[in-house]
Amino acid sequence: MTNCLSFRNGRGLALLCALLGTLCETGSGQIRYSVSEELDKGSFVGNIANDLGLEPRELAERGVRIVSRGRTQLFSLNPQSGSLVTAERIDREELCAQIPLCLVKFNILVEDKLKIFEVEIEIKDINDNAPNFPTEELEIKIGELTVPGTRFPLKTAFDPDVGINSLQNYKLSPNDYFSLAVNSVSEGAKYPELVLERALDREKREIHQLVLVASDGGDPVHSGNLHIQVIVLDANDNPPMFTQPEYRVSVWENVPVGTRLLTVNATDPDEGFNAQVSYILDKMPGKIAEIFHLNSVSGEVSILKSLDYEDAMFYEIKIEAQDGPGLLSRAKILVTVLDVNDNAPEITITSLTSSVPEEGTVGREIALIDVHDRDSGQNGQVEVFVLGNLPFKLEKSVDQYYRLVTATSLDREQISEYNISLRASDGGSPPLSTETHITLHVIDINDNPPTFPHLSYSAYIPENNPRGASIFSVTAQDPDSNNNARITYALTEDTLQGAPLSSFVSINSNTGVLYALRSFDYEQFRDLKLLVTASDSGNPPLSSNVSLNLFVLDQNDNAPEILYPALPTDGSTGVELAPRSAEPGYLVTKVVAVDRDSGQNAWLSYRLLKASEPGLFSVGLHTGEVRTARALLDRDALKQSLVVAVQDHGQPPLSATVTLTVAVADRIPDILADLGSLEPSAKPNDSDLTLYLVVAVAAVSCVFLALVIVLLAHRLRRWHKSRLLQASGGGLASTPGSHFVGVDGVRAFLQTYSHEVSLTADSRKSHLIFPQPNYADTLISQESCEKSEPLLITQDLLEMKGDSNLLQQAPPNTDWRFSQAQRPGTSGSQNGDDTGTWPNNQFDTEMLQAMILASASEAADGSSTLGGGAGTMGLSARYGPQFTLQHVPDYRQNVYIPGSNATLTNAAGKRDGKAPAGGNGNKKKSGKKEKK
């Protein structure tokens, strides 16, 4: 490819078209251009983008740049046009001197591909220099006796241009005595000589003025002038003569300054002044006069300045020998500089990738290095290698370029940074070497998932923990770095008891600390199985799981719960039955309690906290069985009150209490008969207090009785067909009816309004007792164990109701019994015609539910001695081995209304007032008492 460029010089050249840009591919990746010297900065050299197969914009994108080994940049890249341009004005004479072919070599690096292209540019000479003589004037002395035809050497002109632009011819100004002869040598140099054509006559003309013109072959032609002054002397017919026209000498570049190279010698056969020879170093352009010294007297040539083979390997020195009158002769000295290994190799990092990803492919380019040694021959032969056992190697590229590539895969987790040392050694003796160091960072890729130090974890947290409490901390390790090692924690979604697991436990995504979102209850669940996921922040992210078993530790947060006797909901008190004939160790009842805690916190112990008759009963420490501690005596009260405490073994221990009422009698009718005559014993010192209590209770009783009357009237209106109180009529309107219902199917005396009525025929006072609830939840509640004082209702109060017959009590209907078929059973089938007017829907249902609960709770207990006989009414039959609902007698057979002639029957035919056939039960009881 040829480019025609134009330029202007200072003298007004219009246009010079020359062959400038011949581009060719020489070998692999070699580009060649040609350009003229003295072009302006930025002048076009060649379309480098097109020759590289790139678009102009890709020069910057792909990192295309010039590599010139530290020399002055003569050329640059224009990223806009994609062309190679001059970086400054180029002077071929300064760059290449007299070398005919001036070549500038450099390399172009394509950064992203780490590819090198060799570029060679030929600098074309232009005729920018005129021939120039060393001096402007030359004085020649010629004897008048000089024979015509004698030749006198003249100063040669020097033109730094080459080729046709260099010195081409000499021309002497016209004269009558002298002519010009030009001698050409093999190197192409031309030496002018002044030829004497006619004999001189000093007497006619002593001085001759001549002009020697040196011209080049350029267009336009440049020339230089030398003014010659010829002085006619007396006769000196022999010039000095060198022993040899050319001297050759070789010298090592490292010789010291002042070293003598050689001595030249010239002789003159004349005598006297005409034979005195002096040596002159011809004035030559360049730095020869600064490097070499010629002794004008001895002809000794020595070194003034250190030689450097790398700067110049050859010197040509021109010398002259002149006698006294001025005759001279010429010779030249050829100095060859010998190379020594005085330069260590140079390592230049042309391109460098400071970081590479780990686990990359083998052969990944890291750096492009240029290795150069300024020495020559074996001294310039360089070998470069990587020091140490590192996973890198060097591959030869073009010229003296090497590529540093990976030899194996890199693993950042093993080595994250490499300090690569490169050593270049030449082949000299001794060899010289140079080292350079490259720091390479290995970029992490996400090739390692987070790992936990353990396969699974176990954590423990006590129940009733505060919300937000820290439970446990898990930590995973990731050998990667930065985001690839930034770990986040999460819980795998799951459900627990129908609720999402995230509502129970949360985890801090950054620290791995688990927190409780709610207060745990050991009684609800005892352990949680969690799956913790640790994920890094790489792309794509990697994760791993670990199982965490969270165990809830039991705390003593539940007090014992008493199942039997169940705490009543209507304020009544249950009664347990103990026969007076019971022997020591007789099982009266059993307190059954459970604790929702576990372990030692649920280990229960029972003890008798308080008893109305100390020493009469005992409680099993671990069984809760209430047994008689001794035989029952006549002096023992009919009604015994016991407070039993149930305590667990937690820290601190929790407890609950229950109040038991034990009736000492063989049968329920005996209890009913005895309760009517019981008078609460008052302490002597409590008379005043009793009076105050009677007055207070009397006031409350009035309000209470009024309410009872209203309620009873309402019920009588609804149950007007009931024959429960037919015989008594309205006589008991002022007294609330009592219902003997067992709680849990066992307790015999459960009064709806929680009071007891005792009416006697021979007393003017009736006793109305309002007992307090006799159970408590904790040991602190002890007031329930105290016996309430009775409230006396006077006869006057009863007379206000207008019926004095209420004080006359009819004997109880002892024949009020139910046949076996009429008693309630599990099937609930009774003859509707035989059931009297007693309401049975509500109470039978309650009785059935209570007995089912009791049967389920205690059916397995076979140690009881109580049975379901007629004397005990089956109140404690739950401790029997065959307790069923059929063993429970009808509670209505033992109910009567004190102070009333009315009796409850289950048949319409038994209302004639006659004593029933089975009315001897009370007589038998009286007989037993008399015997005692």
Curated annotation (Swiss-Prot):
<dbReference type="Pfam" id="PF08266">
    <property type="entry name" value="Cadherin_2"/>
</dbReference>
<feature type="transmembrane region" description="Helical">
    <location>
        <begin position="693"/>
        <end position="713"/>
    </location>
</feature>
<feature type="region of interest" description="Disordered">
    <location>
        <begin position="806"/>
        <end position="841"/>
    </location>
</feature>
<feature type="domain" description="Cadherin 5">
    <location>
        <begin position="453"/>
        <end position="562"/>
    </location>
</feature>
<keyword id="KW-0472">Membrane</keyword>
<feature type="glycosylation site" description="N-linked (GlcNAc...) asparagine">
    <location>
        <position position="419"/>
    </location>
</feature>
<dbReference type="GO" id="GO:0007155">
    <property type="term" value="P:cell adhesion"/>
</dbReference>
<keyword id="KW-0325">Glycoprotein</keyword>
<dbReference type="InterPro" id="IPR020894">
    <property type="entry name" value="Cadherin_CS"/>
</dbReference>
<dbReference type="InterPro" id="IPR032455">
    <property type="entry name" value="Cadherin_C"/>
</dbReference>
<feature type="topological domain" description="Cytoplasmic">
    <location>
        <begin position="714"/>
        <end position="932"/>
    </location>
</feature>
<keyword id="KW-0130">Cell adhesion</keyword>
<keyword id="KW-0812">Transmembrane</keyword>
<comment type="function">
    <text>Potential calcium-dependent cell-adhesion protein. May be involved in the establishment and maintenance of specific neuronal connections in the brain.</text>
</comment>
<feature type="domain" description="Cadherin 2">
    <location>
        <begin position="134"/>
        <end position="242"/>
    </location>
</feature>
<dbReference type="Pfam" id="PF00028">
    <property type="entry name" value="Cadherin"/>
</dbReference>
<keyword id="KW-1133">Transmembrane helix</keyword>
<keyword id="KW-0732">Signal</keyword>
<dbReference type="InterPro" id="IPR050174">
    <property type="entry name" value="Protocadherin/Cadherin-CA"/>
</dbReference>
<dbReference type="InterPro" id="IPR013164">
    <property type="entry name" value="Cadherin_N"/>
</dbReference>
<dbReference type="GO" id="GO:0007399">
    <property type="term" value="P:nervous system development"/>
</dbReference>
<feature type="glycosylation site" description="N-linked (GlcNAc...) asparagine">
    <location>
        <position position="685"/>
    </location>
</feature>
<dbReference type="GO" id="GO:0007156">
    <property type="term" value="P:homophilic cell adhesion via plasma membrane adhesion molecules"/>
</dbReference>
<feature type="domain" description="Cadherin 6">
    <location>
        <begin position="570"/>
        <end position="682"/>
    </location>
</feature>
<dbReference type="InterPro" id="IPR002126">
    <property type="entry name" value="Cadherin-like_dom"/>
</dbReference>
<feature type="compositionally biased region" description="Basic residues">
    <location>
        <begin position="922"/>
        <end position="932"/>
    </location>
</feature>
<dbReference type="GO" id="GO:0005509">
    <property type="term" value="F:calcium ion binding"/>
</dbReference>
<feature type="topological domain" description="Extracellular">
    <location>
        <begin position="30"/>
        <end position="692"/>
    </location>
</feature>
<feature type="glycosylation site" description="N-linked (GlcNAc...) asparagine">
    <location>
        <position position="545"/>
    </location>
</feature>
<feature type="glycosylation site" description="N-linked (GlcNAc...) asparagine">
    <location>
        <position position="265"/>
    </location>
</feature>
<dbReference type="Pfam" id="PF16492">
    <property type="entry name" value="Cadherin_C_2"/>
</dbReference>
<keyword id="KW-0677">Repeat</keyword>
<dbReference type="InterPro" id="IPR015919">
    <property type="entry name" value="Cadherin-like_sf"/>
</dbReference>
<feature type="domain" description="Cadherin 3">
    <location>
        <begin position="243"/>
        <end position="347"/>
    </location>
</feature>
<feature type="signal peptide">
    <location>
        <begin position="1"/>
        <end position="29"/>
    </location>
</feature>
<feature type="domain" description="Cadherin 1">
    <location>
        <begin position="30"/>
        <end position="133"/>
    </location>
</feature>
<dbReference type="Pfam" id="PF15974">
    <property type="entry name" value="Cadherin_tail"/>
</dbReference>
<keyword id="KW-1003">Cell membrane</keyword>
<feature type="region of interest" description="Disordered">
    <location>
        <begin position="902"/>
        <end position="932"/>
    </location>
</feature>
<dbReference type="GO" id="GO:0005886">
    <property type="term" value="C:plasma membrane"/>
</dbReference>
<protein>
    <recommendedName>
        <fullName>Protocadherin gamma-A3</fullName>
    </recommendedName>
</protein>
<keyword id="KW-0106">Calcium</keyword>
